[in-house]
């Protein structure tokens, strides 16, 4: 029957009690040995039910010792329940409840036959002191030396390093492989099933780096190894891996100072420097060149140097297997150093006091016990300072998880610093314990539960005590016969635990070192009903639930301790009682002191008393409510009875009730008779019943098949109905979509119709406007035609008058020519003398006479009168580009530069072309000269419009010609263009009238007009 994982972990971590080496520091003396010798070796099993631990007496001799040993090996346990058995084992170890913490150490055998050990609590302190003294004196130095090894981390580390450096390469590679594989193993504090969890794979167990961290560090160190390290550095790093293995196995890293690490690294560095060929050549060459050592002396003593130091060739690179192992070991060493330094930085500085604390003892007391509870999968509670167990429900989950992580981390850190020798000793202890455990199991009933019936036939002369049942507040036990052969009567009176019985108890009970009063011990008066080995039965009451107790059984006559048992009471089943008991703030893993035990018992008794009082009060209240309810019903019935006035009705009701009672009694009697008659069922009726039953079953099958068909039909109908409903829904949706689409199309159609109607109205409005515009244009055209007619009439009048004027001018010109011909020639060749000119004397002489004297025979009058026009619009044409209508007009003559026959002909005169075509000033311009003057040919040409052109088209042409690329109407002279031909006609008419009236007119163009201008 294998032991639980918690047992294996805890027994592996017990180094202080089973030969494990310390951390290198000398432990100081402890004031209380109970702290060191408390319950370290207890185990937490996985079985349910009570647990017990029995310390068997060791004062037997001869056959009694052999029989006792056999009985102890096959120690039976009386159990009242199959799942609440306890089993005693040699050495004080037992298998029990998972919430149980055992606490017995192996006591030494004293010469006087007493049982030595810290668990032997006696009322007589002197006897206890004597037993402890004799127990300590019984351990000789050889036994102590063979059990406990002295911790020498420096010596162990250096010895292991020297041993590793002397190993062959193949063996050394195997050692490195085994050491490297240990880094991937889960720590002993981790449960077997938790290695596959995400926490342990990716986060890493407490106290060790995670798998991802190890892989990352290995990859980084491998990159540095391949890129930056030469051959000598690789070989040096390979030996540094040996140093790490030696430090780990020898416990060199347990101390606070790094002296061991520096010494080992220095040894390896010196060896590599001495073995280096380059350094040897440099040192020898320097010594020889400096003439410190002669070559002859060097060759004479060179044989003293080991052959392996004489390198004739450079070192070769190590193999890739050894390189990978060395890289992994060094990477994990660096990670461990970094984690250790961070842990030291987070850890607060210890208090400065003169007292030196035993670090190994404190680690063994707290850390080792924590290691038994470090697996959250196997342990879900812990003990309080008074021995009570605090479950996970009584503590916050986050604090519990943090404390569990901290305990695992501390346990793994202490375990990682454990020296190699301590590990070997702990392994030896674990192996021996498992061997004893398996041997004890082989002698029992092969894993079957042991009961009191199994003790029959076993002779126990000196008695035996064992636990039979454990409750939350009571412990029941049974004992054998303690009467000796020479004394058949009780010789003493029990100090405590006495009951009202005629027979005196041979022993009394001490709980946690305190005599317990609430113990009931009874004797078996009828040995035939019980086992022949059971003489006494007892019950220890007044205990607190969820607490650990050490029950000692002491003889009344000699005050000798028979045995001691470590028992833990289970938690209370009653939720109210469990809530009434306060939870301890600090967990503890050993039994409490007598005072604390009594206080806890008193508190438990008071809690039970308060609970019973509360239940009593609750029962009283319930009874009061029930009584009040019954009283109300009684009053109701009384009122109804008193209010009943119809006696006939009451009589009929009573007769009916009597009739019902009589019928019920008759039916009951008939049923009784039928039951009596059916005592023996006939075979024919049985066969008929079988047939009817078969028929019933067939009908039932038919009914089931019909129901199944109905269900199938209903399902098919429901399916068809659902499909039809879905089709109906889809059709309805499609119809709704079509309706919506129809609505949208109708709205669009209405919008189009309204838009068309609006467009028709717009066309009608535009047509009306166009018609009105055409009417206006026709009216305007009619008015223009009327104006044209009037203008044409006026033009004809002007032409008549002009012809008359031309006739007059012709006559005047002829007269002037005749007069000039009649005058004599000048007396001098230079011309007329000053003062002799006829023009000054006769200003009324027409200019036509002067024109006859010019060599070109050009007339000044021809430059003043334009030709006649047949239309009023022909005045826009230039007189230069048109033929004269009058035969005597001088316009017919070509316009060229005249040449004089006299030497003075080239001189400028008022008759030259510059004078003839002289521009008029802007301050003296007549309407006729502005309209018909030859100085504005471009402007006149631009203003010329053909006859019969629409005025609107003329306006459009004017608008088109008003751009940048069109010719302006005012011409280059900068004159304002004439806005309308009607205005020009009017001005011409006015000018004509003024010319006819006198010589001062501005529009006639007559010589008098010219003279007027000249004046």
Swiss-Prot record:
One of its GO terms (cellular component) is membrane. PROSITE patterns: PTS_HPR_SER. Residues 722-732, 1005-1015 have a biased composition (Low complexity). Residues 596-753 form a coiled coil. Residues 35-55, 126-135 have a biased composition (Polar residues). It is a multi-pass membrane protein. Residues 992-1004 have a biased composition (Gly residues). It is found in: Membrane. Keywords: Coiled coil, Membrane, Transmembrane, Transmembrane helix, Ubl conjugation pathway. Residues 733-742 have a biased composition (Basic and acidic residues). Residues 1-65, 102-135, 337-367, 573-597, 722-742, 952-1015 are annotated as: Disordered. The chain crosses the membrane at residues 158-178, 211-231, 254-274. component of the regulatory network controlling carbon source utilization through ubiquitination and deubiquitination involving creA, creB, creC, creD and acrB. Involved in resistance to acriflavine, and required for normal growth on a range of sole carbon sources, including fructose, cellobiose, raffinose, and starch, and reduced utilization of amino acids, including GABA and beta-alanine, as sole carbon and nitrogen sources. Belongs to the acrB family. This is Ubiquitination network signaling protein acrB. It comes from Emericella nidulans (strain FGSC A4 / ATCC 38163 / CBS 112.46 / NRRL 194 / M139) (Aspergillus nidulans).
